[in-house]
């Protein structure tokens, strides 16, 4: 394999200067998603976008199935009688709920699920009898509905979240439930690593935890414009839901005890993060494992008389790749130039492009172009499959490395409010000394003009032996670092 063109990746200026405008452009031009559906916050997945989504869903299923989770499917309707049982939950969600206001004869009030804790608990109560039925781990990938009043954005802030994976687990005690929380965090790390996403893991502050949770752990990625995007959450719910739904089990000692529960969710936001993180002004780069087409083959010939010279080697190449289990597509469109096809498939994020022209036929070789760096290599046909496998692995590693390098360069510490404000304006995530007091934390948010992501779980959260003061409450000694950022 011989390098014949050095790296010359596309610029990212347009992406960074107006990320949402760029994202709309990508979704439209790459034929991923259509935003023109006439309901605010509800959009259409187009065939190519749906193929990407299915690959991500299969990844999610794989890591849940491998860890003892079982897939279920619950109705979209939740009786208000159930929804209203957990006081903090209804307080947190009632303003976002879509109500079923009509439907045949007037009957009980129904809501369209915003999340399914209150739908699942009444059924779990019927399924669990004694300690032998625990732990119980189920998940579903469904639509959930939230009446967003803020500005909606495709895949990022929706009224219908159509790829909502929610897992719900039930345990005998707090210790086992918190072990499940740790496992859920590991599952999400594996999913996001496969998507080549970099992430911060934060314990959300009390004022921003999931409604009805004892605590919430969140995964946040930082987009190229410096704003954070929440891409996954894990909640320890304690006995908050099992108390009100009377979910108990008979223990081995013959006593009846309350079960403990967890829940954790991920949605199409993760796909948005993947497309944007690996995006540039030419389109995006899909991680090879998740790309519907891993290799596109472009025949290069001029005039119909050259086609019979080139096409046999093109088809041989495609067959070799197919037989090796590589997802390959040959673009044989005669009404499009090779240059147009290069642009088109770069836009759609296909990781590798194979070019075969008349000179390549004479040498029994092909030219491989990487989407991430636009480097080109000349490879003999006999070595092509091995070269493609090697380059796909290299593309994946480069996407992951690049994402982590960019994220790590954005996290800074600030021991002064003005320094913190300046860092936020530069698109940084700022770690600020905090006493742990909720009122002081909320005041820090206001002073800095950013949102609190919480305390870091992927780094040392303690300020250690430093004599630092809470930046909003100077009379208090700081104990923790509080992360803040601008946020989608």
UniProtKB/Swiss-Prot annotation:
Biological process, per Gene Ontology: prolyl-tRNA aminoacylation
Keywords per UniProt: Aminoacyl-tRNA synthetase, ATP-binding, Cytoplasm, Ligase, Nucleotide-binding, Protein biosynthesis
Gene Ontology CC annotations of this record: cytoplasm
Reactions catalysed according to its record: tRNA(Pro) + L-proline + ATP = L-prolyl-tRNA(Pro) + AMP + diphosphate
Keyword ATP-binding: yes
EC number(s) from the headed UniProt entry: 6.1.1.15
Cell compartments where the protein resides: Cytoplasm
Keyword tRNA-binding: no
Domain of life, per lineage: Archaea
Listed Gene3D superfamilies: Anticodon-binding domain, Bira Bifunctional Protein, Domain 2, C-terminal domain of ProRS
Main location: cytoplasm
CDD domains membership: ProRS_anticodon_zinc (cd00862), ProRS_core_arch_euk (cd00778)
Gene Ontology molecular-function annotations: ATP binding; proline-tRNA ligase activity
Entry comment, domain topic: Consists of three domains: the N-terminal catalytic domain, the anticodon-binding domain and the C-terminal extension.
Subunit comment: Homodimer.
Family affiliation: Belongs to the class-II aminoacyl-tRNA synthetase family. ProS type 3 subfamily.
The protein's role, per its UniProt record: Catalyzes the attachment of proline to tRNA(Pro) in a two-step reaction: proline is first activated by ATP to form Pro-AMP and then transferred to the acceptor end of tRNA(Pro).
Record-given protein name: Proline--tRNA ligase
């Amino acid at each position: 394999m011989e390098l014949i063109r050095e790296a010359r990746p596309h610029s990212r200026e347009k992406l960074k200067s107006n990320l949402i405008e760029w994202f709309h452009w990508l979704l439209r031009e790459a034929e991923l998603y259509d935003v023109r559906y006439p309901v605010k916050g509800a959009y259409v997945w187009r065939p190519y976008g749906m193929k990407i989504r299915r690959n991500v869903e299969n990844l999610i299923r794989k890591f849940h199935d491998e860890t003892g989770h079982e897939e279920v499917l619950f109705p979209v309707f939740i009786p208000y009688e159930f929804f209203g049982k957990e006081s903090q939950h209804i307080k947190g969600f009632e303003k976002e709920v879509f109500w079923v206001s009509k439907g045949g004869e007037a009957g009980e009030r129904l809501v369209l699920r915003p999340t399914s804790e209150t739908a699942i608990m009444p059924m779990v109560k019927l399924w669990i009898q004694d300690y032998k039925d625990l732990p119980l781990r189920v998940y579903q990938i469904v639509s959930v509905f939230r009446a967003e009043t803020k500005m909606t954005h495709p895949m990022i802030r929706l009224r219908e979240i159509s790829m909502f994976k929610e897992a719900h687990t039930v345990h005998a005690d707090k210790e086992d439930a918190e072990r499940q929380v740790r496992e859920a965090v590991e599952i999400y790390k594996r999913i996001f690593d496969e998507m080549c996403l970099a992430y911060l893991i934060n314990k959300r502050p009390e004022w921003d935890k999931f409604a009805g949770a004892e605590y919430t752990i969140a995964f946040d990625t930082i987009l190229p414009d410096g704003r954070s995007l929440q891409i996954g959450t894990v909640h320890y719910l304690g006995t908050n839901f099992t108390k009100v739904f009377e979910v108990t089990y008979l223990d081995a000692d013959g006593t009846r005890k309350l079960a403990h529960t967890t829940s954790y969710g991920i949605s199409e936001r993760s796909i948005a993060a993947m497309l944007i993180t690996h995006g540039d002004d030419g389109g995006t780069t899909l991680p090879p494992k998740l790309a519907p087409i891993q290799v596109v083959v472009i025949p290069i010939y001029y005039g119909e008389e050259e086609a019979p010279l080139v096409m046999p080697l093109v088809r041989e190449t495609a067959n070799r790749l197919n037989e090796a289990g590589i997802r390959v597509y040959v673009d044989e469109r005669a009404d499009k130039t090779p240059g147009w096809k290069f642009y088109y498939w770069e836009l759609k994020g296909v990781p590798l492009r194979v070019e075969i022209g008349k000179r390549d036929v004479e040498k029994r070789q092909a030219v491989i172009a990487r989407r991430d760096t636009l480097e080109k290599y000349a490879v003999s046909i006999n070595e092509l499959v091995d070269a493609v496998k090697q380059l796909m692995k290299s593309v994946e590693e480069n996407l992951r490395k690049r994402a982590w390098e960019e994220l790590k360069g954005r996290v800074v510490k600030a021991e002064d409010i003005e320094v913190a404000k300046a860092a936020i304006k530069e698109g940084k995530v700022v770690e600020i000394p905090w006493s742990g007091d909720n009122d002081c934390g909320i005041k820090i948010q206001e002073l800095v003009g950013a949102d609190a992501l919480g305390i870091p779980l992927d780094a040392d959260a303690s300020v250690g032996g430093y004599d630092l003061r809470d930046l909003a409450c100077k009379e208090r000694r700081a104990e923790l670092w509080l992360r803040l950022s601008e946020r989608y």
